[in-house]
Amino acid sequence: MPRITASKIVLLIALSFCITVIYHFPIATRSSKEYDEYGNEYENVASIESDIKNVRRLLDEVPDPSQNRLQFLKLDEHAFAFSAYTDDRNGNMGYKYVRVLMFITSQDNFSCEINGRKSTDVSLYEFSENHKMKWQMFILNCKLPDGIDFNNVSSVKVIRSTTKQFVDVPIRYRIQDEKIITPDEYDYKMSICVPALFGNGYDAKRIVEFIELNTLQGIEKIYIYTNQKELDGSMKKTLKYYSDNHKITLIDYTLPFREDGVWYHGQLATVTDCLLRNTGITKYTFFNDFDEFFVPVIKSRTLFETISGLFEDPTIGSQRTALKYINAKIKSAPYSLKNIVSEKRIETRFTKCVVRPEMVFEQGIHHTSRVIQDNYKTVSHGGSLLRVYHYKDKKYCCEDESLLKKRHGDQLREKFDSVVGLLDL
């Protein structure tokens, strides 16, 4: 896959200089073509910029109105496809493949066509958290035919072998070879994926607390999957405010079938889409809900410093983080300032994860199910350096868990009151 190299930067500077000279000193003829170190032909700066955009998938540069919508494409009554991606990682799931996320009611044989040519190797990969529900999630793996470049693939045709019914699925993401990603290529250091915002699950003030507190902790982007039709006016106003201020990205998410036919409201779809959305874009991505906060334990270390230490081993792709249940006795925001009593027990089963997205192939709700290389590791952290505060309406006793309040209390109160007043919540 082409990359942004020093020679391309030098070429860009040289072209800019030439354009300036030509503008001030017109000449009869111009040099027709330039070449980079790979022999790629460039006629102007625009072609270089086009090449750069092929290398890194930048969502905000895609002129597609559906980019912030999880688009389910119907193959037939028993199959929906979405979020197709090219996968340039040479790992334990094969190389090179175009992959398609699918909800299906039963396993069947499928074929794929890429740029008019049939894929010679097609297989289904089942997610580990389907729990024998009617609708189950799979990844359809389609081997890239020889002679086709990933960057020239814009869609894949998925065909049910028995009926010949098909659907064309646009490529949504381009996943780079994770071994050649450099630190300066990430847009964000830390982001959060919120798999689902249910219409009556939280009020607008809880959202304000969640966004402001995580911003204070250094989170640069929060991705929220929600069905806008289920939200009340205050919630819509609050989400729009933060979306307009670029602190959150809203992704519209509406299942194409009944929720009771799929495990846990179909959150595997949003978790996986958000994993792909952050791959190559964010260094560390957290998966948690609005009533959960990742908390660094050591006072002198920030969240980013704590996470960086936990991922010091470059083969670690995921950290399963233990949590403490906090008694949400006072049911008004900011919860983190008013509720500080937890149970003594550390919860190590229903963990939450922070991951290096490019190293993960399958992410679950509470654990990482598969990494992309056999030598990559998913490890568990018992809460000594990092833990999750989970606020629940239960009587927990009797430990003090006021780390968030002590560290960010004054700033959070100021920012919370400011936004609540501004939006008249």
Curated annotation (Swiss-Prot):
It holds the Pfam family Glyco_transf_92. The keyword Metal-binding applies. The chain crosses the membrane at residues 9-29. N-glycosylated. Can also use Fe(2+) and Co(2+). Inhibited by EDTA, Cu(2+) and Zn(2+). One of its GO terms (molecular function) is metal ion binding. Residues 1-8 are cytoplasmic. InterPro entries: Glyco_transf_92. Its main location: Golgi. Expressed in intestine and coelomocytes. Residues 30-425 are lumenal. This is Beta-1,4-galactosyltransferase galt-1.
